[in-house]
Amino acid sequence: MRLATEPASLPSGLPEPRRVAVLSVHTSPLAQPGTGDAGGMNVYVLQTALELANRGVDVEIFTRATSSADQPVVPVAPGVLVRNVVAGPFEGLDKNDLPTQLCAFTAGVLRAEATHEPGYYDIVHSHYWLSGQVGWLAADRWAVPLVHTAHTLAAVKNASLAAGDAPEPPMRSIGEQQVVDAADRLIVNTEHEAQQLVSLHQADPARIDVVHPGVDLATFTPGDRLAARAALGLDANSRIVAFVGRIQPLKAPDVLLRAAALLPDVQVLIAGGPSGSGLISRPGAGGLATPDNLVNLAAELGMTDRVTFLPPQSRDNLVQVYRAADVVAVPSYSESFGLVAVEAQACGTPVVAAAVGGLPVAVRDGVSGALVDGHDPGDWAGTLADVLAADPATLSRAAVDHAATFSWSHTVDALLAGYGRAIADHRARHQGQLARRSGRRFSMRRGVRA
């Protein structure tokens, strides 16, 4: 038996879940962020699960097995299990082909639940639309509420594609609409995302909870910049702008390279691996942000000696990357929040980010960094130069202060409140349905006696 280290702080009268089934079909929370499809969502799923467990809530995370070496059940921490569900081939299955394996995945989830006593889970929380499709069926089968977090929306991504990038297929938009309609509650990162759900998918605002993601404030902390640079083999005296994340057109690392080319004394550090359309160099799409194309672009811009590429980094090494940089750039075309921006600021590093999606929440414009409208390299170069010229101590303090307003504890406070509302509403609907059925049976009996 586990003891909660911190009581769940729910609004008075809301029920508290005992056990949560979390669905993350397309990417495991144990995967290294910055590789394949692993990114901020992986961090979110794992960190919220750990914090829920700290509150005494048991969490089982279901994800698709991607290797024959994956154990069926992986205990992560007391109260947190990851279940690797076999659904389709372990390797070589593109994310766009995963819908063909949702039936197999759903069957695996239902089989796992069948090993528990009836009524084991109190709630299902699905992440991304693929998981939402599974969650829709599982929640209905188990007669529990479905809470869904989209993380990204096809309509939003398609409205702001990088040049040459592939749009999301219509199948995804249809699937997202189905999940929005089926979910008892929808969790979004920002008010802006809530507005998008309402305008694009006609979501009921009363069913939406705004829950800011957090940051591990015990891990991501300020530190010695020179020591961090020495650990990474970087020059002690250079001005360094870092990019951290998956290398794909959506994240726009090529925009950073073109901007840095206009700043001759700036070094660029890129830490991450290919993902999505960043895995493929298509004919006629030479500008796409694939690793090979970025290397070629650096050569074309005459700045090969000013760009350092690192593979995806562990959390401890990632802290060193943030500390080593003078500025972290987040030039994404679309970003529902931007955990990288908050992690960097927690390490005392200011951020220059695109003014899209949730980044205006993650970065305090003019205080902890700066926001840039659009993706013109000249505009980015000018903003980077301004931030690099500002007082670093003032920016660093402001960055740390802003990041301190985001924590996984605060995230889970709000998440538990959303869970409580979902459970309460679901129970009320169920009781109402029972009452209506009982009333109909009574009326029928009276009619027979008459």
Swiss-Prot record:
Q: What class of enzyme is it?
A: transferase
Enzyme Commission identifier(s): 2.4.1.250
- Which reaction(s) does its UniProt entry say it catalyses? 1D-myo-inositol 3-phosphate + UDP-N-acetyl-alpha-D-glucosamine = 1D-myo-inositol 2-acetamido-2-deoxy-alpha-D-glucopyranoside 3-phosphate + UDP + H(+)
One matching Pfam family is Glyco_trans_4_4
InterPro entries tied to this protein: Glyco_trans_1, Glyco_trans_4-like_N, Mycothiol_biosynthesis_MshA
Where 1D-myo-inositol 3-phosphate binds, per the record, is at: 26, 37-42, 95, 128, 152, 172
GO molecular function annotations of the record: acetylglucosaminyltransferase activity; D-inositol-3-phosphate glycosyltransferase activity; magnesium ion binding
Amino acids binding Mg(2+)? 322-323, 325, 349
Question: Could you tell me the superkingdom of the organism this chain comes from?
Answer: Bacteria
Which residues does UDP-N-acetyl-alpha-D-glucosamine bind?
32-33, 40, 246, 251, 313, 335, 343
Keywords of this protein's UniProt record, alphabetized?
Answer: Glycosyltransferase, Magnesium, Metal-binding, Transferase
Q: Which GO terms describe its biological process?
A: mycothiol biosynthetic process
What does this chain do?
Catalyzes the transfer of a N-acetyl-glucosamine moiety to 1D-myo-inositol 3-phosphate to produce 1D-myo-inositol 2-acetamido-2-deoxy-glucopyranoside 3-phosphate in the mycothiol biosynthesis pathway.
Query: How does the record describe its quaternary structure?
Result: Homodimer.
Q: Identify its protein family.
A: Belongs to the glycosyltransferase group 1 family. MshA subfamily.
UniProt name for this protein: D-inositol 3-phosphate glycosyltransferase
User: Which organism encodes this protein?
Assistant: Mycolicibacterium vanbaalenii (strain DSM 7251 / JCM 13017 / BCRC 16820 / KCTC 9966 / NRRL B-24157 / PYR-1) (Mycobacterium vanbaalenii)
Gene it is expressed from: mshA
